[in-house]
């Protein structure tokens, strides 16, 4: 199939031209013949088209696409067609419905094309004023003024950037350089905090290194596919097509879907297990107990490659630790109070008995600050912690469908264990937001590895625990580049002095420039805005005021506090509407870039067309803003509370002057200018940042922008890849990626890696494993504290080349249904729309398919309240309420007691309802469970 993008001029010949070509391409893709006349017309049409490889804009699958452009008489190009790339190994020519409309997202009627500033009648900035068009110079003038006001008052902690898992890799790298290296602030955090942070911490705590061991090839090699909180049929549809193909190709292949509600993934499943929200923790522990009791542990694998570990349990829920905070409504405070202490429930009295904790006791959450601390324990202690998770206990705790018999549910749990334990079966566990957006997201991620490591079914072709990424570059940018508030590139962290030293050397910064104090994670940035501790924020490539739970608080903070909010956007979404300054931004095919997908595959693309109006790429925006800061303004002051000293004199000793700008140092230094604008890759190509373009957009100084004159994207890439070379994060050079359909890192001697940690396939496992079959080299040369089930000791245990198997108990979520709010709420996505809908709701075909978010509900729950199909209802929690239309027979079929509401529709602003509890370790918000009531509107 090919999606055609028609031009604005309604000439019949052009229309017929494109229709013929698109029809021919679509027919060919499904093996149909077409009339010879139409075929000839199509061939003539496509002679004027230029096809180039690119990457889909949407999920973390990383599908390759082909983009067709056609130039008009003035040399301006427009995208005229999109199709799947048959040479792309991920999708093999197939796209999902969103992928076919990748180009149409760029041509919405309300595309932002000029900077917009809130002003009063005199044209002066006024936070309560209305938006008015301004020049880029005027926009940067106000942006600079407000930044320096906040920075001079509060220092590096007073400013923040909301980054993205949809940044290109070079954009994310530029943002980290500017914020952490230039402004000396660690207050940059991506929306990937909402989607992948729990997976990241699960990887880091288990393996000492981030990202999956396996790859998509596991789908074709496995016998058993288990999805945990992953509606792959809608959220990763192209991968699901591969799962479907594998399932239908062999009667031996089994699919099991674990979910809190029935969805399209259930349709293919041999077994569907509907569990109560949060009880996946107990099901994983049941599996581990079964493995041990059935003598199914791969003892040789575990002895050679694993150590056992545990941590504190009284760690809170990532909420504010002050329930009397003046911004809370009275009805919010009882739930927030559990951040300080809670009463142990009857179920917790059973699951925590190994710690001597009893039901009815008060548990003080005094280890919240040490939530990530963990230590080694014995195998005997590990077994003791699993004793409560019998079939009877877990079945009664976890059964999520009231209409299902307990015996049926028990049988499903037994079958699940049978499939995992069968020594003759390969097995892959896939999960996404159901496990990541979880108040114990780190724990439940670690539990997946617990089961696979006990069985010796990890890092092997066809077997492994596999976290599926949600966003197109949550892996490649947010994680690998390190746009989180605690990270640096290649899994390094700001708190490690050696890591800061390495970074300062690559960036040519004075020693001591980087800030050692971890910055504010995504949700804390919002809370700090509410408290007045952050007074300037820049939003890039995401929509935080729609995508953050408990949204009423943050909208009030943006509009009522003394702060300045900048939003770089392509369309007027909710975040743009609450901003003080909107910067019009180039979209994916209007710039050069790269993404990294869920199987560690890095893919690059070229700019295909020029952005409309005055919209400019994010790299350009950061580079122009960097010109506004002399080194004397950002490096000549120390901050005792942050242990930051002045580094201006050290900078002078390196050859810099106090008049040099951050642009000169970070983006236009001598190394950067060695990357020529005459590069062969640029021949006959658009590159707005390097060469300028026909629009002659005004730059930050009020002059026509003619390009930087050096290949800034290539410079950023080649500098960035220095971090990973030789450190098991090796990436290929820039030119190589433009020749291939992506490579899975580490890329060593031109060879990609399919299965990490396995010496048959991984260069580093061979190099560092001392002849072993497996080497979990993220923990090479490391040790950790030993201890008991309750606490660490002074002793150490080696974890050299080993992975950790964690004991993590079941605990209740902080908010559960009760008499006043009797139903669970789960949020998520639908196939047709992407995240907040800012792009996909502008595509007519996608909008017509799903024009609004619905409230999916069980018919019996509706009947109990005399509610009917398509009736408008209120969905209300302790935090807020929204109206939505009921769907009692749609694609999502919740059990009694649970509703599902997608979050793509700003008119059904469901994040006003959601609870802002997080995993205390990963700081990732739990969007999958809170208590609500539903009633007639």
Swiss-Prot record:
The Gene Ontology biological process annotation of the record reads: Mo-molybdopterin cofactor biosynthetic process; nitrate assimilation
Q: Which residues bind substrate?
A: 903
Asked if the Swiss-Prot or TrEMBL record annotates the protein with the keyword Repeat, the reply is no
Q: Name one GO cellular component term.
A: nitrate reductase complex
For this protein, the parts annotated as crossing the membrane are none
Q: How is the cofactor bound?
A: Binds 1 [4Fe-4S] cluster. Binds 1 molybdenum-bis(molybdopterin guanine dinucleotide) (Mo-bis-MGD) cofactor per subunit.
Task: Give binding positions for Mo-bis(molybdopterin guanine dinucleotide).
Answer: 98, 166, 191, 195, 228-235, 433, 437, 543, 568-569, 591, 618, 827-836, 911, 928
Q: What compartments host this protein?
A: Periplasm
Matching SUPFAM superfamilies, A to Z? ADC-like, Formate dehydrogenase/DMSO reductase, domains 1-3
Kindly list the GO molecular function terms attached to this UniProt entry.
4 iron, 4 sulfur cluster binding; electron transfer activity; iron ion binding; molybdenum ion binding; molybdopterin cofactor binding; nitrate reductase (cytochrome) activity
Mod. after translation: Predicted to be exported by the Tat system. The position of the signal peptide cleavage has not been experimentally proven.
Give every 4Fe-4S Mo/W bis-MGD-type domain span: 49-110
The signal peptide annotation in the UniProt record is 1-42
The cofactor named in the record is:
[4Fe-4S] cluster; Mo-bis(molybdopterin guanine dinucleotide)
Q: Sorted alphabetically, which keywords does the UniProt record give?
A: 4Fe-4S, Electron transport, Iron, Iron-sulfur, Metal-binding, Molybdenum, Nitrate assimilation, Oxidoreductase, Periplasm, Signal, Transport
Catalysis performed (reactions)? 2 Fe(II)-[cytochrome] + nitrate + 2 H(+) = 2 Fe(III)-[cytochrome] + nitrite + H2O
UniProt cross-references to Pfam families, sorted A to Z: Molybdop_Fe4S4, Molybdopterin, Molydop_binding, TAT_signal
Sites binding [4Fe-4S] cluster sit at 56, 59, 63, 96
Principal location listed in the UniProt entry: periplasm
Enzyme Commission (EC) number: 1.9.6.1
Assembly, per entry: Component of the periplasmic nitrate reductase NapAB complex composed of NapA and NapB.
Concerning its family, UniProt says: Belongs to the prokaryotic molybdopterin-containing oxidoreductase family. NasA/NapA/NarB subfamily.
Q: What role does this protein play?
A: Catalytic subunit of the periplasmic nitrate reductase complex NapAB. Receives electrons from NapB and catalyzes the reduction of nitrate to nitrite.
Name of the protein = Periplasmic nitrate reductase
Species per Swiss-Prot/TrEMBL record:
Helicobacter hepaticus (strain ATCC 51449 / 3B1)
